[in-house]
């Protein structure tokens, strides 16, 4: 029996404040709007193109 694939859980990337939807993570500057960057302890990284921004 094959293992089940983990879902993307995109609902965790948004929150509602004052009746408006607010994005929690940044978009990738290379891929454009719609592709979120992953928030790590020391960096922001894009899983699609591999772009990385280091935190200071």
UniProtKB/Swiss-Prot annotation:
S-S pairs: none
Cofactor: Zn(2+)
Residue ranges of coiled coil: none
Cofactor binding note: Binds 1 zinc ion per subunit.
InterPro entries per record: Ribosomal_eS31 (IPR002906), Ribosomal_eS31_arc (IPR022845), Ribosomal_eS31_euk-type_sf (IPR038582), Ribosomal_zn-bd (IPR011332)
Keyword Ribosomal protein part of the UniProt annotation: yes
GO cellular component, one term: ribosome
GO biological process, one term: translation
Annotated binding of Zn(2+), by residue: 28, 31, 46, 49
C4-type ZnF: 28-49
GO molecular function, one term: zinc ion binding
Domain of life: Archaea
UniProt keyword annotations, A-Z: Metal-binding, Ribonucleoprotein, Ribosomal protein, Zinc, Zinc-finger
Classification via Pfam families: Ribosomal_S27
SUBUNIT field: Part of the 30S ribosomal subunit.
HAMAP family per the UniProt record, alphabetical: Ribosomal_eS31
NCBIfam families: PRK00432.1
Family named by the database record: Belongs to the eukaryotic ribosomal protein eS31 family.
Name of the protein in question: Small ribosomal subunit protein eS31
Source organism (scientific name): Thermococcus gammatolerans (strain DSM 15229 / JCM 11827 / EJ3)
């Amino acid at each position: 029996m094959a293992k089940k694939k983990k879902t993307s859980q995109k609902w965790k990337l948004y929150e509602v404040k004052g009746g408006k939807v607010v994005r929690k993570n940044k978009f990738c500057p290379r891929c454009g709007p719609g592709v979120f960057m992953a928030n790590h302890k020391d960096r922001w990284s894009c899983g699609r193109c591999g772009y990385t921004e280091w935190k200071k």
